[in-house]
Each structure stands twice: as C-alpha cells, then as structure tokens.
C-alpha cells in the first residue's frame, strides 16, 4: 500500500474553498486500487491555510493510472486557470510499512 499526499498552501481564510471540492463523491472512488481519501486542515498556521489531500492506494501504479485518466484531467482542468487562492503545493509518496488497528478490530 502507498499513501500519496498533496499539501497545498492557500491564502489565509480560504482553505474551505479547496476542502469543499472534496466534500462529495467523485470519480476517484471508482478507480482500481483506490483505498480511501482524507482531507486534512493543518492547525495553527499563521500566514496561510494548509490543506493536505491524503489518498491511499494498493500500489503506485494504481495512483499513476488515476493521474493518467480522463476523470483526473477533468477534475484538475482548472477552467479559467489555477485558482488565485492557491499559493503552492507539494506531492509526496509514502510506502506503508506498518499498519496498526484498534484492539476490537484486531480480534
């Protein structure tokens, strides 16, 4: 399993604009190898808002299949250009090495 994060710096007070885009079912849920998605808002930032989109995949190839799909291109087309509230973003890939579950789930 891998986790891919997209951490985005957003003008202060506008983090909700990006968060709202993910608060509905989309095409990613239909993709092969997709395991889940979380939207995280960093606490206590001063100069900007920071939103991290964290997705879980069976394998990196599954994530790459998503990024090459027409559904991905449609979702990221930014008609009218990149939103002006986005300052910067960074993509990171993580190999999951250990997963722990609550005791009730482990039994």
Swiss-Prot record:
Cross-referenced InterPro entries: ABM_dom (IPR007138), Dimeric_a/b-barrel (IPR011008), Heme-degrading_MO (IPR050404), IsdG (IPR023953)
Residues reported in the UniProt entry to bind Fe cation: 6
GO biological process: heme catabolic process; iron import into cell
Transition state stabilizer (site feature) positions: 66
Keywords for this protein: Cytoplasm, Heme, Iron, Metal-binding, Monooxygenase, Oxidoreductase
Predominant place of localization: cytoplasm
Catalytic activity as recorded in UniProt: heme b + 3 reduced [NADPH--hemoprotein reductase] + 3 O2 = biliverdin IXalpha + CO + Fe(2+) + 3 oxidized [NADPH--hemoprotein reductase] + 3 H2O + H(+)
Entry superkingdom: Bacteria
Coiled-coil intervals: none
Binding site for heme: 76
Cytoplasm listed as a keyword: yes
GO CC annotations, alphabetized: cytoplasm
The enzyme's E.C. designation: 1.14.14.18
Classification via NCBIfam families: PRK13314.1
Similarity comment: family membership: Belongs to the antibiotic biosynthesis monooxygenase family. Heme-degrading monooxygenase IsdG subfamily.
Binding partners and assembly: Homodimer.
PANTHER family: HEME OXYGENASE (STAPHYLOBILIN-PRODUCING) 1, SIGNAL TRANSDUCTION PROTEIN TRAP
Protein name: Heme-degrading monooxygenase
Gene: isdG
């Amino acid at each position: 399993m891998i986790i891919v994060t997209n951490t985005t710096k957003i003008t202060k007070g506008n983090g909700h604009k990006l968060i709202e885009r993910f608060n509905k079912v989309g095409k990613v849920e239909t993709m092969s190898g997709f395991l889940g998605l979380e939207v995280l808002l960093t606490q206590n930032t001063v100069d900007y808002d920071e939103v991290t989109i964290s997705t879980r995949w069976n394998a990196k190839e599954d994530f790459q299949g998503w990024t090459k799909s027409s559904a991905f291109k449609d979702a990221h087309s930014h008609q009218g250009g990149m939103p002006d509230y986005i300052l910067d973003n960074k993509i990171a890939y993580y190999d999951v090495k250990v997963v722990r579950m609550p005791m009730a789930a482990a039994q």
